[in-house]
A protein has these predicted regions:
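Alpha-helical transmembrane segments and immediately adjacent membrane-interfacial amphipathic helices
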Residues: 3-26, 43-165
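Membrane-interfacial, low-structure loops and terminal tails that flank and connect transmembrane helices
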Residues: 30-41
Length: 165
């Protein structure tokens, strides 16, 4: 069991990077549906935050089972704000909108990756950073209330894809 958890901890960043490179700014059919639903529905964004929270809790559990140190407790404390949807929404929006904050978070994650005992903090920071890249920007969410945005579906979808990132 412990070997499986070590394997998950080791492979997770690489799987997340592969997912990022395969899906970021791609116009696949399921990604278009994802873009549209996350922009148009608050419940879809809420579900996205719940899935992110579930992944973070699972990673914290894997870290706790394999390495019990203070970094795991710090990673668990970093996960707590994602239990509140409005706070998680604000965090993901700020990371998505501010390139400086996103790069700082990723640099901090890479620094934590170099120290073996800080792996759990790396996993939380890296997962949240990648998740914020797929979160819709505030600009495209505010565009959905404009009167000219409610034309036909195809035009609406093209505007969402254009301004999503």
């Amino acid at each position: 069991m412990i070997q499986i958890l070590y394997t998950i901890k080791f492979l997770f960043p690489f799987l997340l990077m592969a997912l990022f490179f395969c899906l970021y700014k791609k116009e696949y059919g399921f990604m278009k549906r994802f873009y549209y639903k996350v922009v148009m529905s608050y419940n879809a964004r809420k579900f996205y935050c719940i899935v992110l929270l579930t992944v973070l809790i699972f990673l914290n559990w894997c870290s706790f089972e394999t390495d019990q140190n203070y970094a795991v407790a710090c990673a668990a404390l970093m996960t707590i704000p994602f239990m509140f949807n409005k706070v998680a929404d604000r965090i993901l929006h700020r990371l998505h909108e501010s390139l400086r904050l996103l790069v700082t978070t990723l640099i901090l994650a890479m620094v934590c990756y170099t120290a073996p005992y800080l792996n759990s903090i790396f996993q939380v920071l890296f997962t949240v950073s990648v998740a914020s890249l797929f979160y819709p920007s505030e600009r495209v969410i505010s565009m959905k209330s404009l009167p000219e945005f409610t034309t036909n579906f195809i035009a609406r979808l093209n505007v969402i894809i254009k301004f999503y990132y």
